[in-house]
């Protein structure tokens, strides 16, 4: 009788352990939303960055259509911008203000939505920096030149003499060169 009780209690314990084993993996492998996975990737970018300030998510491209398999790698594309918070700050980047004229980077790669899997493969490149782009002032049309006034009746001003020729003796002109001596062409008869 005692053996039957022991086997029944052992059966119950094994059933409880089986149920517990089925429940625990699903709780530990909770899937992240697409945005949460991207925010984790931004945190990893900040951890590995050698720059002075933290980066914060600026723009997130739409998620891929097939988000059924949480463990598979998903293509992603997003933009981050430099914040005013130093990299050593304990403050999360989402609470930091964007730095005026801060660096902007476009990140492209793959992420996973599985919380236990911390794999991501991203390549972030600096976009044309806002601080380097200055808006050009609008081009205004050139002003038209003023028309010359019509001559008015009345006395005309006396024109000033030009600085040339100067008064004084004129130089003697050089004589024209004479033809060279030598054979003369013979005229042809008509």
From Swiss-Prot:
Disulfide bonds join 85-96, 107-124. Residues 1-29 form the signal peptide. One of its GO terms (cellular component) is extracellular region. Keywords: Antibiotic, Antimicrobial, Disulfide bond, Pyrrolidone carboxylic acid, Repeat, Secreted, Signal. Residues 30-130, 190 form a propeptide. It holds the Pfam family Cathelicidins. Elastase is responsible for its maturation. It comes from the Eukaryota. Residues 133-145 have a biased composition (Basic residues). Large granules of neutrophils. The gene is CATHL3. Belongs to the cathelicidin family. Residues 146-190 have a biased composition (Pro residues). GO terms for biological process: defense response to bacterium. The modification Pyrrolidone carboxylic acid is found at residue 30. This is Cathelicidin-3. Exerts, in vitro, a potent antimicrobial activity. Probably due to an impairment of the function of the respiratory chain and of energy-dependent activities in the inner membrane of susceptible microorganisms.
